[in-house]
Amino acid sequence: MISIQQAEPHHRDGWERLWRQNIVNFGAPDMPDDVIDGLWQRILDPDHAMQAWLAIDGTNDDHTVVGLAHLIIHPHTFSLRNVAYLEDFWVSPDHRGGGIGGLMMTALQKQAKQNRAARKDGFPPARE
């Protein structure tokens, strides 16, 4: 069973494994460890705009992280409401095609709504 959860400290290893896959795929394989550490600290800081949402496979004992998304909720100049910006989205290649991306997008849409986002940037159009 797949669950979508906001990242917590114990998710670090699984998040980092997927994050490194993502940055290699998008051409930044040499990202320094201190940048990755700083990103993780931002994600865990409740006062920071950046959030990480993870797809967790609960069918095994280690609850493997199989998907990640970075969501940034921030103010903008055209409304007093926030904007939800989808910065990164990655599903482990060996878990693609099973609906995990759709589950994650549903959870991210819900999070944007809960944060009263006036607009959602970086979100792909819904697929049928």
Language-model segments: residues:
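Conserved acetyl-CoA-binding loop-helix of GNAT-fold acetyltransferases
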Residues: 97-110
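Conserved GNAT acetyl-CoA-binding A-motif
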Residues: 112-125
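Short, cationic motifs built from Arg/Lys/His that form the positively charged side of catalytic pockets
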Residues: 5, 96-97
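Short coil/turn motifs at secondary-structure junctions
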Residues: 74-76, 94, 127
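A short, internal acetyl-CoA/4′-phosphopantetheine-binding micro-motif in the GNAT/acyltransferase core
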Residues: 89-96
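Conserved beta-strand edge residues that scaffold enzyme active sites
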Residues: 33, 126-127
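Conserved residues at the C-terminal ends of beta-strands
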Residues: 72, 92, 123
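Acetyl-CoA-dependent GNAT
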Residues: 2, 6-81, 87, 111
